[in-house]
Design a protein with these regions (language model features):
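N-terminal signal-anchor/first transmembrane alpha helix
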Residues: 1-67, 137, 154, 163, ...
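Alpha-helical transmembrane segments of integral membrane proteins
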Residues: 9, 139-144, 148-172, 188, ...
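Hydrophobic alpha-helical segments of integral membrane proteins
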Residues: 8, 12, 16, 54, ...
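Hydrophobic alpha-helical transmembrane segments of membrane transport/permease proteins
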Residues: 23-80, 84-100, 203-225
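Short, hydrophobic secondary-structure boundary micro-motifs
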Residues: 45, 88-89, 121-123, 191-192, ...
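Membrane-water interface segments at the C-terminal ends of transmembrane alpha-helices
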Residues: 30-36, 66, 179-212, 238-244
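Transmembrane alpha-helical core residues of multi-pass small-molecule transporters
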Residues: 18, 26, 152-153, 180, ...
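An internal, D/E-rich "acidic patch" concept
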Residues: 4-5, 65-154, 158
Length: 365
């Protein structure tokens, strides 16, 4: 028992260390990828109204007048929970209250070491609005969309997988498999355009669904926001098509494999009806690969919602990324990509912990 606990602890420690290195690699890649792009960030911030003095002031304020290596160190310092800050007001790393929410740890002669929330900097195009605030306002909508999509995928995918397995080699089975293949191969942006046009425009009189819309919309008087759940239906269905197709295939194949096991034959020999055999023994023992698929797909949906959100006008993080790309708003792009990567890593760690808890072989390997 002690050996198992030690193996599990070592496993989790190794996963945490590997994840930190992965996150560091992602941060480095994001920084250098966007800093080799053509264009001057200071000019992007000022637009067409800049003059030489304004340009110099902005470059000094945001550290754009420093070398790439120095800017990289500034970027790491901004993102790190424990960071060093100069006591000189003219220095980029000066501890400004409007930039950092920090707790002082150690005060030195020329620097202060603090504990803070990661600082993702400010938007180029939104009048200095904090990137963290933009993400805080849009990420919940993306999470709601991803959760809705995965719920749709689980319910319909498992149901279709069971029907397909029970009616193996029938026309219904072949039709479900064909639909699954199409669902897995169909790009999400094409599905979004097709669904928005057909259900939101052609059949609008019957469905009452709109081509675009978000979770919260202003009322007719422009006084308050109301929840519009019907705007969630089309984007959630479109985003859930691919995981639905995968889950239905996994459920079908696993259920067929389970139904050929010896204990299923024993249950049949005892006189249980086929319905009870499938319900009590088949389905329960076929869900492991589905759980695996769901945990992996949920992280993918957070990143894959970009085009779906933009096409349906869903005010989530994906739509914000596309808008930032159109406006060359680099801090918003970098911060959003970094948050998505961080969520990927966290979800993968949680999945590995679940595996280690469920399957002893993971603890030993």
């Amino acid at each position: 028992m002690i050996l198992i606990k030690l193996n599990l602890t070592n496993f989790l420690f190794n996963k945490l260390i590997n994840s930190l290195f992965t996150l560091f690699g992602v941060v480095t890649l994001i920084f250098f990828l966007f800093n080799v792009l053509p264009g001057d960030p200071a000019q992007m911030m000022l637009g067409q109204n800049e003059n030489s003095q304004q340009l110099a002031n902005v470059k000094k304020k945001y550290g754009f007048d420093q070398s790439i290596s120095t800017q990289y160190l500034y970027y790491l310092n901004d993102l790190s929970p424990i960071s060093f800050h100069s006591n000189e007001e003219e220095n980029y790393t000066f501890l400004q209250e409007n930039k950092y929410s920090a707790i002082e740890l150690i005060k030195l002669k020329s620097h202060t070491i603090v504990f803070k929330f990661p600082y993702l900097r400010t938007s180029f195009t939104m009048q200095g609005k904090k990137v963290s605030e933009i993400i805080r306002n849009t990420l919940p909508n993306t999470i709601v969309l991803a959760i809705s999509a995965i719920i749709i995928a689980i319910i319909i995918g498992i149901f279709l997988g069971i029907i397909s397995a029970v009616l193996k080699d029938s026309y219904i089975d072949k039709a479900i498999q064909l639909i699954s293949v199409i669902g897995m191969s169909l790009p999400s942006f094409f599905s979004a355009i097709l669904f928005a046009w057909f259900f939101g425009y052609v059949l609008n009189e019957y469905t009452s669904l709109e081509m675009t819309g978000s979770l919260y919309e202003l009322d007719d008087y422009g006084e308050r926001y109301n929840i519009k759940l019907k705007n969630l239906i089309l984007p959630a269905i479109v985003l859930g098509i691919r995981p639905l197709a995968v889950i239905s295939q996994l459920m079908r194949n696993e259920l067929l494999d389970v139904l050929n096991q010896d204990y299923i034959r024993t249950a049949r020999a005892k006189g249980l009806t086929e319905f009870n055999v499938i319900k009590s023994h088949g389905i329960k023992n076929s869900l492991n690969p589905v759980v695996t698929a769901v945990s992996g797909w949920f992280a993918s949906l957070l990143a894959g919602a970009v085009f779906v959100e933009y096409i349906f006008g869903w005010n989530g993080l994906g739509k914000e990324i596309v808008n930032a790309l159109n406006n060359l708003d680099l801090p918003v792009i970098m911060g959003s990509v970094l948050v998505i990567a961080f969520m990927f890593i966290i979800i993968n760690i949680l999945v590995d912990i679940i595996y280690a808890w469920i399957d002893p072989r993971v603890k030993l390997n």
